[in-house]
């Protein structure tokens, strides 16, 4: 596979992932997250690992949002109905930020891809205001299995996944 084919394949994969986000269960996930975050208004927010910018875009309606994402292809497909600052970057980008800059830091479905989690959390702590908070969401493999059963009605696929993982229900 040449570079152009690899890039095309990656873009198609990202488009498929974006369709999943826009499916009813993806929309439900985000509505639950936003409800748990509460009414944020006039806050300085960092969305680290912003992906397609779903959360950054939503929160930018009433807040000053900076989104950082390393994947340029995801940024090309991002949501941008509301105005927010989108940066291409990694933990190195955080090191350029001043101390205690953000009221809220969002880190959703990112930690599983970070090599040095301790360094990332230390940077979050440094740039978070004293009265601020961090919202962390991490993928849950068993949750994905339940999603297939409950939301996608793929019971046979779920049973196969459970058998292959030696997961038992009580």
Model-derived features: where do they sit?
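Conserved class I S-adenosyl-L-methionine
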Residues: 1-41, 43-51, 54-58, 74-77, 133-163
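Class I SAM-dependent methyltransferase SAM/SAH-binding core
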Residues: 52-93
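A short acidic, Gly/Pro-enriched loop at the edge of an enzyme's catalytic core
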Residues: 95-105
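A short SAM/SAH-binding and catalytic strip from SAM-dependent methyltransferases
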Residues: 104-116
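A short glycine-rich, Lys/Arg-flanked "PGG" loop and its adjoining helix->strand segment in the class I
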Residues: 118-133
């Amino acid at each position: 596979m040449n570079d152009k084919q690899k890039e095309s394949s990656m873009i198609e994969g990202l488009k498929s992932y974006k369709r999943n986000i826009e499916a009813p269960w993806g929309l439900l996930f985000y509505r639950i997250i936003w409800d748990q975050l509460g009414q944020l208004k006039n806050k300085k927010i960092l969305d680290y690992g912003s992906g397609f910018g779903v959360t950054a875009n939503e929160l930018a309606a009433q807040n000053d949002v900076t989104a950082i994402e390393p994947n340029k292809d995801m940024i090309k497909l991002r949501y941008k109905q509301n105005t927010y600052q989108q940066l291409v970057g990694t933990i190195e980008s955080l090191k350029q930020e001043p101390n205690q800059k953000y009221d809220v830091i969002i880190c959703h479905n990112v930690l599983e891809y970070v090599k040095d989690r301790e360094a990332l959390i230390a940077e979050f702590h440094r740039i978070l205001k004293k009265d601020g908070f961090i919202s962390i969401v991490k993928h849950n493999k068993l949750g994905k299995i339940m999603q297939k059963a409950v939301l996608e009605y793929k019971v046979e696929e779920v049973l196969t996944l459970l058998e292959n993982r030696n997961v038992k229900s009580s």
